[in-house]
A protein has these predicted regions:
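Absolute protein N-terminus
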Residues: 1, 22-24
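N-terminal signal peptide c-region/cleavage motif recognized by signal peptidases
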Residues: 15-17
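Cleavable N-terminal signal peptides
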Residues: 10, 20-21
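Short beta-strand->alpha-helix linker/helix-N-cap micro-motif
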Residues: 25-90, 104-107
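A broad, structure-centric signal for solvent-exposed, well-ordered loop/edge residues
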Residues: 8, 35, 47, 78-79, ...
Length: 144
């Protein structure tokens, strides 16, 4: 029985080693030649002192750097909604935007804590696709 167990372990080890040594090739056959138009609207702010980081601009730059999105310049935006219900889909369709990100940053009074509520809105579907709340300290703003 001991030899059988050893032989079984050896066979399993060989099979596992063979699988580990096999390499898979990933072939990319197509991509996108046009980035998706998106607007990251300046986030609303509720706090006593100016916010040290422009979280909307950071988000827009991160999206641009993926190569998959083309964030709209703020100067071309017709409005600056803070919540999804303030979005006028007709305006965004007119300027060729498919998605809009809106948000609100709040400083919790008397603390170093901040809360960011943001939503991703589909202009074509006229609905919120994602809504999330994250929080952190002032030193964590860029990571929020």
């Amino acid at each position: 029985m001991k030899r059988f167990t050893q032989a079984l372990i050896a066979v399993i080890a060989l099979c596992t080693a063979q699988l580990a040594l096999s390499q898979e090739a990933i072939e990319i056959t197509s991509g996108t030649d046009k980035a998706t138009p998106i607007a990251v609207v300046p986030f609303g702010w509720q706090g006593s002192a100016p916010l040290s980081e422009d979280l909307a601009e950071i988000s827009a730059n991160d999206l641009r750097n993926t190569g998959m999105f083309a964030p709209m310049e703020r100067s071309n935006m017709l409005s600056y909604p803070v919540r999804g219900e303030e979005i006028n889909s007709r305006d965004w369709k007119m300027i060729g935007v498919d998605y809009v990100v809106v948000g609100q940053v709040t400083n919790q009074p008397g603390t170093d804590r901040y809360e960011l509520n943001y939503s991703l809105y589909s202009i074509l579907r006229e609905q919120v696709l994602l809504s999330k709340t994250v929080s952190g300290t002032q030193s964590q703003l860029r990571d929020m």
